[in-house]
Amino acid sequence: MTEVYLGIDTSCYTTSLFFMDRQGEKVAEARRILKVKPGGCGLQQSEMLYQHIRNLPELMEEAAQGHEFSLLGIGVSAKPRPREDSYMPAFLAGQGFARSLAALYHIPLWQISHQENHLEAAMWSAKGPEADRFLFLHASGGTTDLLLAEKMAGVAAEKNVNEAATTEKKSGEVAAATKNKKVAGNYTLKEIGCSLDLHAGQFVDRVGVALGLGFPAGPALEQLAAQHTEILEIPVSVHKTEVSFSGPCTKVLRMIEQGNFAGEEKDSDITQVIATTEQAAATVQTATVTQQHYSAANIAAGVQWGLAETFVRMIRNAAKEYNCNDVLLAGGVASNQWIRNLIIEKLAKRQIRVWLPENRYSGDNAAGCAAYARRQSENQGII
């Protein structure tokens, strides 16, 4: 019989389970993307909750097949972000499932936020950063946050763990968090940057659906962009560590609505910035174009370029202001390989080290919940 910690995450579009052993290695996992009708742009919370409730027992059967588990503890995402005012019904499915198992087997239950789950999963997979202080970029459909993570030392870290355990034993909640600074495991997280309007994933999904792709559109957009012949540079809006995707998204959607893509014959007299793949990583040339037709692939590549350039400027500004040379990336948008490569290339010129989890642990998963439960339980000597 294998002793394991169970991680559970029921986000907006994925149901996830993860089993981790005492050595911190994966034993089994199962996840399922929620179904969205073709042409749809999302799900209502009631539909998310319904699908999660149906998925959880089926995924448990799938993950447990061929194994005999002895549960030591459970970690679950209970809300979107580590804030007192953070709430989303979708997480009630996983939270209720976790509480029932914990009560039945009399084992510790650790409740964290979906964002903390991303942090924990990314650190577990990337095996770092090792620095006591680093930047954390969480870019997904529901979040575009840049945070400063600082390791708590000695007595402060021990006090935090004990307080969290006491709080959870009494009320099943994570340690209290303020608006801009919160506790994640043995780290404090300070919000230092964000999107002022659309999140990165919303930008991707809106353009993807307009191009006829399914929802969520991230993986399909990346595949489409791989067919590009040139990269359309879209506007980038960054002020220090605050960014905006609303303007760039509107511009791209207008181009699609006007039909200036996919080989359609339509004259236009507009000025655009165009770059080849190599130029996108270095110098971009400006050209006035007549009779310009943008393929869907070139538009998709332009969206990727705009996201990567936005993240690079955001991280670069924060690294300078907070004197940090390490950044950890997580979130569905951050799993895009082309975006990753461009970020690494550009930040390397500034001696900023980029830490990347495996793609499957950048998007929604439950590995972080399991890793958190394992560390907290064993640090306290509960098991």
What are these regions (language model features)?
Residues 107-135, 372-373:
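Conserved phosphate-binding catalytic cores of ATP/NTP-utilizing and phosphoryl-transfer enzymes
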Residues 324-343:
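Glycine-rich phosphate-binding loops at beta-strand->alpha-helix junctions
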Residues 35-67:
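N-terminal phosphate-binding loop and adjacent alpha-helix
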Residues 118-121, 357-383:
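Glycine-rich phosphate-binding/hydrolytic loop that grips phosphoryl groups
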Residues 59-72, 314-324:
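Phosphate/pyrophosphate-binding loops at sites that engage ATP/ADP/AMP, CoA/4′-phosphopantetheine
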Residues 3, 10-11, 18, 27-29, ...:
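A short helix-loop
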Residues 61-98:
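Short beta-strand-loop/turn "lid" adjacent to the catalytic site in phosphate-handling enzymes
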Residues 326-327, 343-369:
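Conserved phosphate-binding/catalytic loops in two-lobed NTP-binding clefts
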